[in-house]
Amino acid sequence: MADPARARRLAVRIREVVASTLERGVKDPRLGMVTVTDVRLTPDLVDATVFYTVYGDETARQASAQALESARGLLRSQVGRATGVKVTPTLTFVHDRLPDDAQHLEKLISVARERDAYLAEVRRDARPAGDDDPYRRPRPAAGEVDELSEVDELSEVDEYGGTARQEG
């Protein structure tokens, strides 16, 4: 197992070498606008996974994947020359889904913001359904005294929030 700091430095160096070789050394017409986003190494530094993105649609992505697979030997030899390690890591190319996922999340967030704005607009002009007081109270029968109205007539709220009896 290699030192984690050494593995990070080697991963950065592999990313730089692969990116510059793709830019200058690979002449495959299938290779589109490829960006190397990340390289991850196994703890024993034998296998390297190269993450990349491609500008364009699905056909450009597939064509670039085929071009990267055919250029894997050239890229590995360039990595071996540039890094000088005892065992040159085997390169595996994986399309990086992070930008696609981020774009999808941005769309979802914008849709949620639009819905929130619409609901805020509806809420601003909304009024409660029915009466202002949503609780139903039984109506007193003719001749009966409503207990609540009797208490209201007999008591008064003082300045401290308590009730005081009215003298009459």
UniProtKB/Swiss-Prot annotation:
The record's Pfam families line, in alphabetical order, gives:
RBFA (PF02033)
GO biological process annotation, one example: maturation of SSU-rRNA
A GO molecular function held by the record: ribosomal small subunit binding
Task: List all Basic and acidic residues biased stretches.
Answer: 122-136
Database matches in SUPFAM superfamilies = Ribosome-binding factor A, RbfA
- Please give the residue ranges the record annotates as the region Disordered: 122-168
Residue ranges with Acidic residues bias: 144-159
Q: Which domain of life is it from?
A: Bacteria
Question: InterPro entries under this entry?
Answer: KH_dom-like_a/b, RbfA, RbfA_dom_sf, Ribosome-bd_factorA_CS
Which keywords annotate this record?
Cytoplasm, Ribosome biogenesis
The record's GO CC annotations read:
cytosol
Quaternary structure, from the entry? Monomer. Binds 30S ribosomal subunits, but not 50S ribosomal subunits or 70S ribosomes.
Protein family membership: Belongs to the RbfA family.
Name the PANTHER family on file: RIBOSOME-BINDING FACTOR A, CHLOROPLASTIC-RELATED (PTHR33515:SF1)
What is its biological role? One of several proteins that assist in the late maturation steps of the functional core of the 30S ribosomal subunit. Associates with free 30S ribosomal subunits (but not with 30S subunits that are part of 70S ribosomes or polysomes). Required for efficient processing of 16S rRNA. May interact with the 5'-terminal helix region of 16S rRNA.
Know the name of this protein?
Answer: Ribosome-binding factor A
Protein species of origin: Frankia casuarinae (strain DSM 45818 / CECT 9043 / HFP020203 / CcI3)
Name of the gene this protein is made from: rbfA
